[in-house]
């Protein structure tokens, strides 16, 4: 088992410094700050601060004046216009094209069946006429 004097010799501390962690904590803080700056986390932190300031400013801005000037109505109209445009983009256009295509195929098939039926009738007439 290690004695206090042997521990003091190993870690090169005086007896009073064994429980004083100031140097160790200071070194950890310095290492954290150095890594923080090297990884440019301070820029991200600054961005967060700016965003929070913008939120505070926007929450403190009086909106009654915007309503009185008609800007909110205009903005609402613009949002509604954009919403309508987005909704038309969401509606599948291929469905209409596909329905038109199927209708055309149906008409063409009906015409073909009618032509085949007409030819069959003509053959039957010609066969009965030759008998």
Swiss-Prot record:
Signal peptide: none annotated. GO terms for cellular component: BLOC complex; BLOC-1 complex; transport vesicle. InterPro entries: Bloc1s5 (IPR017243). One of its GO terms (biological process) is endosomal transport. It holds the Pfam family Muted. Component of the biogenesis of lysosome-related organelles complex-1 (BLOC-1) involved in gut granule biogenesis. Component of the biogenesis of lysosome-related organelles complex-1 (BLOC-1) composed at least of blos-1, blos-2, blos-4, dsbn-1, glo-2, mutd-1 and snpn-1. Belongs to the BLOC1S5 family. This is Biogenesis of lysosome-related organelles complex 1 subunit 5. It comes from Caenorhabditis elegans. The lineage of its organism: Eukaryota, Metazoa, Ecdysozoa, Nematoda, Chromadorea.
